[in-house]
Amino acid sequence: DAEESGDDDGVDWIASRVTAFVGGGDNGGDALYACAILARGGIGATAYLLKKRCHRRALAAAQEAGVRIIDLGGQSLRSIENTPAWSEVFLAHAWIDGIVGTGAHGPLTGALAESVEVLNRLSAIKPRPVIAIDVPSGLTDDDGAITGTILRATHTLAVGTYKRAQVLPPAVEFSGNISLVTM
């Protein structure tokens, strides 16, 4: 899990308005810390909490840095389409994928799978950088197999070391450009 060190390796190419999609584990925590770093650097950052619980210390750091937090309470992004809360999803110059990471097992289900489907659909209509932390959400870390819905990344930040799912076919097609980030 990322330390709130202020290290900005791998984020210098992100535009001025970033939206993160945050799951309940360390991957979501890393996304919140990334938003905090970006916000402290003057970049507008919004984080959508997709699970009822999230990484509390990272959430506090993001809030302290001025990140806009939108808590969906475990509901899918589909629940906010055509509402004012949808604007930060649609207007963002870049997205950070912190939904699930290497600790996830099996395909995405329920609201998370539905949210990823919504994001993939919107990304096809309005392309933008999609930055995954460790692995794109929905990829398994073990063998690179495609077992369900996966958020297609344009960039993947390999934290600490490269992961097998980032480089093994057919999953490699979902990782985009891969950058090694050391903390």
Give residue spans per PLM region.
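Nucleotide and nucleotide-moiety/phosphate-recognizing core
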Residues: 1-101, 105-133
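YjeF_N-associated NAD(P)HX repair module
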Residues: 91-183
